[in-house]
């Protein structure tokens, strides 16, 4: 068993990707835009210039930062009362804690939103470190946010699990040198990430079972 585990947040810990897609669609409909099928996959787990390019591509706006800020503010408003957990999250966190694995969240979301979601969901006490990639120059699929998280945990990346739901996130975890586990949400695993060594689980409960069995 590894000594550290680094969790993505949206779509992995919390069932929030559907909320974000709902908000993006509402903003699109208000502008008379129909989002293509690829939007959910492209927008997931991106930040920085990559995020801006996706917003411009689908919304044809000259102010992608302003639109993203509006989406985030609406998400904050809706998540203040309740943050839905993905099945198996509590069981996995309890298991890792019982086995003295140190835990971090590493998300592309702004730090205030990460902390708010952890607090509202009552998951905050589980985590030793909370890392945001929102201000990094290089976002996923670059490994920077996970390398930062491993450094904050004072562990080599090779002694950490990364748990992700998106292709970009998985590629970032693999590039960081972590044992990377994908639990798909909107994105299905590709042959590329399988060939690069990503582990695929259908749920967080399966992650726990396979760690317990010594597979990871």
Predicted region positions:
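Asp-based, Mg2+/Mn2+-dependent phosphohydrolase catalytic module
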Residues: 1-3, 94-97, 110-216
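N-terminal helical cap/lid subdomain that shapes the substrate entry/recognition surface
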Residues: 2-99
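Short glycine/serine/threonine-biased micro-segments
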Residues: 9, 42, 102, 131, ...
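Residues at secondary-structure transition points
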Residues: 15, 38, 42, 46, ...
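Hydrophobic beta-strand core positions in alpha/beta domains
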Residues: 104-105, 182
